[in-house]
Amino acid sequence: MASFKGFSANTVPVSKTRKDTSSLTATPGLRAPSMSSPVDMAQSREFLTKAIEHGSMSIPYQHVNVPKVDRKVVSLVVRPFSAGAFSISGVISPAHAYLLECLPQLEQAMAFVASPEAFQASDVAKRFTIKPGMSLQDAITAFINFVSAMLKMTVTRQNFDVIIAEIERLASSGVVNRTEEAKVADEELMLFGLDHRAPQQIDVSEPVGISRAVEIQTTNNVHLAPGLGNIDPEIYNEGRFMFMQHKPLAADQSYFTTETADYFKIYPTYDEHDGRMVDQKQSGLILCTKDEVLAEQTIFKLDVPDDKTVHLLDRDDDHVVARFTRVFIEDVAPSHHAAQRSNQRSLLDDLYANTQVVSVTPSALRWVIKHGVSDGIVNRKNVKICVGFDPLYTLATSNGLSLCSILMDEKLSVLNSACKMTLRSLLKTHRDLDLHRAFQRVISQSYASLMCYYHPSRKLAYGELLFMSSQSDTVDGIKLQLDASRQCHECPLLQQKIVELEKHLIVQKSASSDPTPVALQPLLSQLRELSSEVTRLQMDLSRTQAINTRLEADVKSAQSCSLDMYLKHHTCINSHVKEDELMDAVRIAPDVRQELMLKRKATRQEWWERIARETSTTFQSKIDELTLMNGKQAHEISELRDSVTNYEKQVAELVSTITQNQTTYQQELQALVAKNIELDALNQRQAKSVRITSSLLSATPIDAVDGASDLIDFSVPADEL
């Protein structure tokens, strides 16, 4: 018998090989069949009935493995119209348990969702495409989002057939025939038992079977997805965190390609080739409050053509660098919260169905938490949330990042019980004013120097833009710290100015009548640059020295005017060595420190003696009172001891008397017993000596007893009636 590439001649259908599960276990997405024998419930009930009828209480116990029907592992085969079929498997959540009743219809629907070309390559259809490697629950989520976005319908058991019909009608104009490669993939799935249809056996002993096996093995587009294959939760959450900070390229682009592409079509982006901000055409979505000022959260000009539209304009030529649709959180969050409770569709669901990237302002996050309607706002699988709408504002201030992160972790009901103090600290710190003031200092910088932070590759150039420093000459101590690692090619405007200045310098040199040799001109140029640099450094040094002089004067003035006066009039008893070190740290003179320490020691001794006297006076009366009470208690104890001794003597006398009486009574008892024995013997002797004979009896005849005839014989029954 011939064999080829793992297909043996004795290959049998999978349905007949229930005991051999080694190959099935290794197959991705297929669960091994249970080895426990099935239980015949009818036979068990019959056996139990007979045992009860015959009076037998000995019923054998049989262990039955009951599967959890609510978490059943389901395997489906998705057959796209222009690609190879693949298998997905997993558990269906209890919320979607009704899908277990309509698995064939679900497979049919997923085939459409996995074929976006059937809908004329719609962007919405591409966004929710079911792909190989998805888990079953992710595929169901993609299907539900597809129905929500394309059909504006909610998936339920009642309208499932209607949804299938609508999808077929919508795709009727774009459906293509399945390719030959897709059919080959179906055969491979059936071979490994992953298809719901009957498995087909390939007989490799025949030339046709061998060619069929070769065709299956060499097919390129066949993909068997792992049943439980899914995006790593750590990669997914890391990607969400990067989008939240406006760093989309820092996310894993093998999973977030479409979201990243949409991001750079919406948000301000710098084009280094044109040397200007890109004129964006696609509109994004902003969730904000009605009373917040959006102009304080961006470095661009803000244009509001109407109540629902916001444009960000370039500060140089006023072209549009970003377009947004403004939605007030007060109008959509409460209705969305109510719709979630009644299992209905809300306006926010419709808005989220048409976009992948949404901006939420920090004020909107605080509003939904304060009013208890935050569930389902930021924690959505098909939407990536960005805090704020200007990347520079979010990365400079980090305002709202902590609130958004904690809302992505848990529902508000859990946070109010487990993280209540954390929420309180995030909501009541009132840092918005300080952050807005800090961001105004960023805006005051050169507009051209800030453009590099809107470059798509900013994931490697972004550092902390703002940091706090406690300096004496500034209240907030906020400085702009540009990342020194960015390259000059990120600042083309500066490069252009440098080229123009070099050209201008060459023209000036050629026009001047400087007799300096050409070889020395570069050295002189460097010398001039060094001279200007030295001049600048000298100016900085002078400025720093002036600041230091002013600070020293302030310290001396504060020391002489306030600290010395305080130490002179302050009464303190702390004479520890650490106090001397602290006064030395604030620059107190040594003689003053010694005088203060001696004064404190004397004051401490004085107070110690005073407290000792007051304490002894206060407690002397209590000590006398306790001594008197102690004497009284000792006298009472002595009296009690005497009375106890008397009682013991009386008890001893009573015991002696009782003992004597007991001895006397025993002697008398013994005498009585002896007397009794003696009398008994005498009585017996007298009885033996006296004999009753017939001569002693009377010869008089016995007379009848009077009234003997009237006696009733009770042995004879009589009728009492």
From Swiss-Prot:
It comes from Reovirus type 2 (strain D5/Jones) (T2J). The N-terminus is blocked. Interacts with mu-2. Interacts with sigma-NS; in viral factories. Interacts with the inner capsid proteins lambda-1 and sigma-2, and outer capsid protein lambda-2; in viral factories. GO terms for cellular component: host cell cytoplasm. The gene is M3. The record marks 570, 572 as: Important for the formation of viral factories. Residues 1-38 are annotated as: RNA-binding. Belongs to the orthoreovirus mu-NS protein family. Residues 14-40 are annotated as: Interaction with mu-2. This is Protein mu-NS. The keyword RNA-binding applies.
